[in-house]
Regions:
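Short coil/turn connectors at secondary-structure junctions
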Residues: 25-27, 33, 98-101, 128-133, ...
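Histidine/acidic residue-rich metal-binding segments in metalloenzymes
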Residues: 115-127, 145-184
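Hydrophobic faces of well-ordered beta-strands that scaffold small-molecule active sites
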Residues: 40-44, 103-105, 131-138, 162-166
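Active-site mouth loops of central-metabolism enzymes
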Residues: 70-86, 136-147, 168-175
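Active-site gating loops and adjacent loop-to-helix segments of metal-dependent hydrolytic enzymes
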Residues: 52-84, 160-163, 184
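Histidine-rich, glycine-flanked metal-binding segment
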Residues: 1-38
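Hydrophobic alpha-helical hairpins/lids featuring a short glycine-rich hinge
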Residues: 44, 69-114
Length: 184
């Protein structure tokens, strides 16, 4: 609404929204006249495991999804837990500075080590008081087209993934695409 109002915050949460709330003695008052209060924003689709890797190992010169996936396949062999956590933390800092408080990240689980999943699960726990992170087990190489893809998806869920995704258009056949959706 365009009407001026007050917001009483207690223990970091909105307790009351009403006009002319009187502050108790000793309570901090912040004059936000002329500003707007908004809830935290939501980043509904990001790949924090590959955040801040543009140009490493090479640039996606065609700009296509398929070349981007090929670049990522070359990059992910160099992953370490610390590398994933560092880059993801830096990306989250930038998101938080712009009002994002809830992040859904897709994590490539077509990696036999599941190192990115492990790193992001740790980071989710470390940042739990600062940002809400939802982790999607995402089979970048395909559930059926990638060796042991189904098993890797199941392992990611056992590790703590919040939900699963799929990439049916990347599977080798239409039938695999349909089956991958049924599996997910």
């Amino acid at each position: 609404s365009a009407e001026k109002t007050d917001i009483l915050i207690k223990d970091g949460k909105f307790e009351k929204i009403a006009p002319n709330i009187l502050a108790a003695e000793g309570e901090e008052v912040i004059d936000c006249d002329g500003t707007m209060a908004l809830p935290q924003f939501i980043e509904s689709h990001v790949h924090l495991d590959s955040a801040l890797t543009a140009g490493d190992p090479r640039w996606n010169l065609s700009g296509t999804l398929f070349e981007g996936i090929a670049c990522w396949s070359e990059r992910k062999v160099k992953l370490s837990k610390n590398d994933v956590k560092y880059r993801a933390r830096e990306a989250i800092k930038k998101q938080a500075a712009n009002g994002i408080g809830h992040v859904r990240t897709h994590v490539d689980v077509t990696d036999p080590t599941l190192i990115a999943m492990e790193g992001l699960l740790e980071l989710k726990d470390e940042l739990r008081d600062e940002v809400n992170i939802q982790i999607v087990a995402f089979p970048q190489g395909g559930i059926l087209s990638y060796p042991n893809g189904m098993e890797l998806m199941e392992n990611a869920v056992k590790m703590g993934a919040d939900c699963v995704g799929a990439i049916p258009h990347f599977e080798f056949t239409r039938e695999y695409g349909v089956e991958s959706l049924n599996f997910a």
